[in-house]
Amino acid sequence: VALRGQPDQSDPGIASSIGIAFGATSFVVFPDRVDDLALLLGGADAILRAVVVHELGHLLCLVNLSYDSEIDHEDPEHPGHSRDDTSVMFHAIETTAIGQLFQGAPPSTFGDADLADLEGLRTGRY
């Protein structure tokens, strides 16, 4: 679902969010936030791709949302997110905006630890 406007600014947990997954089946994207960041972060398409893959990752239970990973990659400061800033499951794409000006679009693929976790979920290891 795409919602016009901004996330609830009174909730510090989501005030700067570009997308939010909820329940086990749904997520929303805030196109206005995508547009706000498009110039800095490689364009709206690149941001939207990264946000959709990130939120789908949450719907697939990444990172440690319904299991305990054998790989220590969850960011303790941002539960449910990877501490690998090259993974789409990193907690925020806008925190590296200045670097992104020179490096291109934000990550839109899962990191190796995320892929290993997905394999563990698929095979029933978790």
Predicted region positions:
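The catalytic-center signature of Zn2+-dependent metalloproteases
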Residues: L39-G120, R125
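Active-site-proximal segment of zinc-dependent metalloprotease catalytic domains
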Residues: V1-Y67
